[in-house]
A protein has these predicted regions:
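Alpha-helical packing segments of well-folded alpha/beta enzyme cores
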Residues: 21-26, 79, 159-162, 166, ...
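Short, compositionally biased low-complexity segments
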Residues: 1-4, 136, 169-177
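Surface-exposed acidic, glycine-flexible loop patches that form ligand/cofactor-binding
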Residues: 31-35, 166-173
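Acidic/His/Gly-enriched intrinsically disordered linker/tail segments
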Residues: 93-95, 99-161, 165, 169-170
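Acidic/polar loop patches that form or flank catalytic/metal-binding clefts of enzymes
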Residues: 35-41, 90-92, 113-122, 173-178
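Juxtacatalytic substrate-recognition/specificity segment
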Residues: 1-82, 86-97, 105, 109, ...
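General structural signal for alpha-helix termini and helix-helix connectors
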Residues: 85, 89, 165-168, 181
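Short alpha-helical scaffolding segments that buttress acidic/His motifs in well-ordered protein cores
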Residues: 105, 178-182
Length: 182
């Protein structure tokens, strides 16, 4: 597996931090879900403040990648999109389930491993409670991409909770076996 960091300006220390971190997350998720689906991974810095997971790379903003907490929050989320969203592609006509599953296995799971899973789920339920109401709620099958706090609460938080309920119902072993087969 070839790893790259394409930065707007040469910053060896920053590049090294991202390259070391991505190796650990790709190893972790490969053990959890199956082999990494591409021959390379690249962090690509851009001037817009984005965080997009693309097939075999992630496009992240120049200010964003310099926040130290990003290495263990948004970055693993974008790495995981190589499995969900850019490895197994959702049929957007049926709903973009990949954001909820990626949030569940990156944002949530990494905190759960530190004993903070329930706290994270509560925080996500509060987002749903605060931003979604009868007028702006919609079924998960209608979620494409986030374009508001309400759509984020539905497509990420609500769907994350669906995956948590599924895992709770079938158990860890069956849940992970199913993801590996998928």
């Amino acid at each position: 597996l070839s790893l790259y960091a394409f930065l707007l300006e040469e910053e060896d220390e920053l590049a090294d931090r991202y390259l070391q971190t991505v190796k650990g997350y790709i190893d972790f998720y490969s053990r959890l879900l199956g082999p990494y689906p591409y021959e390379k991974f690249a962090l690509v810095e851009n001037s817009r403040q984005t965080g997009y997971g693309m097939p075999s790379f992630t496009l992240m903003g120049s200010r964003i990648i310099r926040f130290p907490f990003i290495l263990h929050s948004s970055y693993p989320h974008e790495i995981l999109h190589n499995w969900w969203g850019n490895g197994v592609f959702p049929d957007l006509g049926q709903g973009n389930w990949s954001e909820g599953l990626t949030a569940y296995l990156a944002d949530h799971l990494l905190l759960e491993l530190k004993g903070k899973g329930a706290q994270y789920r509560f925080q996500e339920m509060m987002k749903f409670s605060n931003y979604v109401n009868k007028e702006n709620d919609f079924p998960l099958s209608a979620f494409g991409y986030r374009d508001s706090m309400a759509s984020q609460a539905i497509g990420y938080a609500k769907l994350l909770m669906v995956f948590h309920m599924l895992r709770t119902e079938v158990g860890d072993e069956n849940f992970l076996k199913s993801l590996k087969r998928f």
